[in-house]
Amino acid sequence: GEVTVVAPSGNQSGTGCSISFRKSVNVNQVPSRVDGVNCFAVRGTPADSVILGSKYILEEDVDVVISGINPGFNTSRNMFISGTFGAAIIASALGMRACAFSMDAVDPVDDFTVANVITAITNELICSDTPPGSLFNVNFPTIPVGGIKGVEGCAPARSELKMTVDLQSD
């Protein structure tokens, strides 16, 4: 199949499912690091990227939307403020299969192991009878290369959403 990347042009941590309402959103085609892959940078949120990619950039139906991979877990209630998971939620709401991928920390060596697992999961989503609108959230712990033994499904935990605020005066 054909792969197209439509992603925010900068970090969008904490944007959740937000869209750029009453604001301009710019899209630019950018050079790809992979032959045959078209890449677009969106000056907007991850959700904006999904909407623009699926409705305006791509001419065919989307088989699956992959969001991420980003450093830091998107587990429990934290996933609801995650831009990575937010993009997957919007894709699912638009009727596409979607999966958000996150990992505890970025490690160039472990990234190759994770890439193989992401490829396998993506292929399963495309080739299986996974219904349109299905939504998945996959988090990889920091483990040695080759340490991934499988994928386990679970419901999100119901932990407290803890946030800190650094108050400053003008």
What is the predicted function of each stretch?
Residues 2-56, 60-61:
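A cross-family phosphate/adenosyl-ligand binding-site feature
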Residues 7-8, 67-70, 101-102, 138-141:
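Short beta-strand segments
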Residues 11, 45-46, 70-73, 143:
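Short glycine-rich anion-binding loops that position phosphate/pyrophosphate groups of nucleotides
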Residues 53-59, 86-97:
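Alpha-helix C-terminal capping segments
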Residues 64:
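Short, Asp-centered acidic motifs that coordinate Mg2+ and/or phosphate
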Residues 73-82:
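Glycine/threonine-rich flexible loop motifs
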Residues 92-114:
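Glycine-rich phosphate/pyrophosphate-binding loops
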Residues 113-170:
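Electrostatically charged, flexible surface regions
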